[in-house]
Structure formats: structure tokens, C-alpha cells
Curated annotation (Swiss-Prot):
<feature type="transmembrane region" description="Helical">
    <location>
        <begin position="82"/>
        <end position="102"/>
    </location>
</feature>
<keyword id="KW-0812">Transmembrane</keyword>
<dbReference type="GO" id="GO:0005886">
    <property type="term" value="C:plasma membrane"/>
</dbReference>
<feature type="transmembrane region" description="Helical">
    <location>
        <begin position="123"/>
        <end position="143"/>
    </location>
</feature>
<dbReference type="Pfam" id="PF04284">
    <property type="entry name" value="DUF441"/>
</dbReference>
<keyword id="KW-1003">Cell membrane</keyword>
<keyword id="KW-0472">Membrane</keyword>
<dbReference type="InterPro" id="IPR007382">
    <property type="entry name" value="UPF0756_TM"/>
</dbReference>
<feature type="transmembrane region" description="Helical">
    <location>
        <begin position="16"/>
        <end position="36"/>
    </location>
</feature>
<comment type="similarity">
    <text>Belongs to the UPF0756 family.</text>
</comment>
<keyword id="KW-1133">Transmembrane helix</keyword>
<feature type="transmembrane region" description="Helical">
    <location>
        <begin position="51"/>
        <end position="71"/>
    </location>
</feature>
<protein>
    <recommendedName>
        <fullName>UPF0756 membrane protein PMI1560</fullName>
    </recommendedName>
</protein>
Amino acid sequence: MSNVDPSLLILLVLAGLGIISHNMTVTLAMIFLLVIKITPLNQYFPLVEKYGMTIGILILTIGVMTPIATGRISAQEVFNSFLNWKSLLAIAIGIIVSWLGARGVSLMNNQPSTVAGLLVGTVIGVALFRGVPVGPLIAAGILSLLIGKS
């Protein structure tokens, strides 16, 4: 047992949390990382680490914008969003969250010691509280405000 890589155990535990909580996102993400780790694909970890967040944000953005692309949300509805107070509030909150996310990326790059706690908290939130794994960026942004760093 002393030859077991601790990161494998962490990924297995997190995959188990995903299974127990019926959270397919966490389960699949951990299995994906386990497969990469224990196969020759592990040579691509630097690429996944470097571009994974960008690719994830790209896929999330595509998913969010698809209703506009398909016409389910019309151009008129988009324009009308500037006339409704709830939509204007949503726009303002979107701006704030984007700003927090940018601060979060900066904090995670400049203070890598914060990453582990943010990731564990996010996975627990996703696995146990049905959260969505966009949390690390926003959490890091909020943390940067609290600790005065970016």
C-alpha cells in the first residue's frame, strides 16, 4: 500500500463521493482523470492542466448560448432584456460574477496554495449539495476580495 500514489486515492474518493451523491459530473470527471493518470495518456496532463479551464469555459459558454443559436430565445427577447428590471439585475450580476471569476483565475495562478482548498470545497459542493463545478473561479474571486489579493 505504500507504493500507492496519494493523488490516485484522492481521485478515487472523489469519484466515490460522486457515485454516492448520484452526481454524474463529478464521477465522470474523476474517472476521466483516473484514466489519464494510469495510462500512457498521462503525458497529456500538462496540456489538460494548461488548457482544461479554457476548454471547460468554452463548452459552458456554448451550452449557455445554444438557446440563442437555436432560436429558442429570440433576438427580440434578448433586446427586451434591457427593458426588464430583473433582466437588468441579471446583467449586472453577470458582470460582477465575470469580474470575480477573473480575479479568481489570477489568484489561483499567483497563489497556488489556495487551489487545493477551493477544489475540495467545490467538489464537496457539487457532490453533496447538487452544485455546479463553476465554483472554483468564483470562490477564488471571493477569496481574493477577503484576503486582499488578486
